[in-house]
Structures are given as structure tokens and as C-alpha cells.
């Protein structure tokens, strides 16, 4: 079973969301998602300042197996991207919940977070796959 930190929220598309002290949210893909994709070779990051709606594809993770869209779990403005992934996309594999984060977003409607899964619900989703 994949590592599913309890303090995070999850989308059904295997993104995770973590609230930061400054009120922004950090987004990445789950350990389960990176295991399915395999070794990352490139991450196409969103543009800082871009406005996205929940469910929009806003980044792409390319691995040796496939390219996979990364979706915004909430609506808002992209306020930062993980530039370290340009040189080290493998951080998504080795540190999916830390150094392998993809982007940070300032949520425009925090009520959307209520529709995301908690760790227990995400684990149940994984068991059903």
C-alpha cells in the first residue's frame, strides 16, 4: 500500500493538496501516481500567475512509461512552481510529498477543498482500483 499522509487532502485523479502557513496550498502527485507512472523524465510546469479552475489540466508529468496530465484540485491562481523539477524531475519519484511538489496555488474558493478526499477515503479509492 502506498504512503498516504493523513494531513493532506487528495483528488480522485491522484493529486494531493497541503495548506501552508501563508494560506496558499502546495500541490503534487501522490506516491501511488508516481509508482504507476514510473521514473520521471520531465515535468511541464504551469505558468506562475495563471488562473485555473478545479479540474483543469495545468501541468504534465512525463515518465519513461507515459505522459500524464496533472489537474488543479482547487480553483485559483498559480503563485509558485517547483523549478527544481526542471533539472531533477526524479524528485517526484523520490520525494512525492516533499521536494517533488509541483506548484502552489492561492485558492479562490476554499469550499472546494471540502469535496476532496481525506486520507481514509483516498486509501479506499486505491483499494477499489
UniProtKB/Swiss-Prot annotation:
The organism of origin for this protein: Citrobacter koseri (strain ATCC BAA-895 / CDC 4225-83 / SGSC4696)
Please tell me whether the keyword DNA damage is annotated for this protein.
no
Q: How does it assemble?
A: The glycine cleavage system is composed of four proteins: P, T, L and H.
One BP annotation, GO: glycine decarboxylation via glycine cleavage system
Q: Is the keyword Transcription in the record?
A: no
Listed A to Z, the keywords are:
Lipoyl
- Could you tell me what this protein does? The glycine cleavage system catalyzes the degradation of glycine. The H protein shuttles the methylamine group of glycine from the P protein to the T protein.
Q: Which family does it belong to?
A: Belongs to the GcvH family.
Cofactor(s) essential for the protein: (R)-lipoate
* Any Pfam family the entry gives: GCV_H
Domain Lipoyl-binding, first and last residues per copy = 24-106
HAMAP family named among the record's database cross-references: GcvH
Gene field: gcvH
Query: Under which name does UniProt file this protein?
Result: Glycine cleavage system H protein
Q: Which domain of life is it from?
A: Bacteria
NCBIfam families with a match to the protein in the record: gcvH, PRK01202.1
Q: How is the cofactor bound?
A: Binds 1 lipoyl cofactor covalently.
Cross-referenced InterPro entries: 2-oxoA_DH_lipoyl-BS (IPR003016), Biotin_lipoyl (IPR000089), GCV_H (IPR002930), GCV_H/Fam206 (IPR033753), GCV_H_sub (IPR017453), Single_hybrid_motif (IPR011053)
GO cellular component terms? cytosol; glycine cleavage complex
The PTM N6-lipoyllysine maps to 65
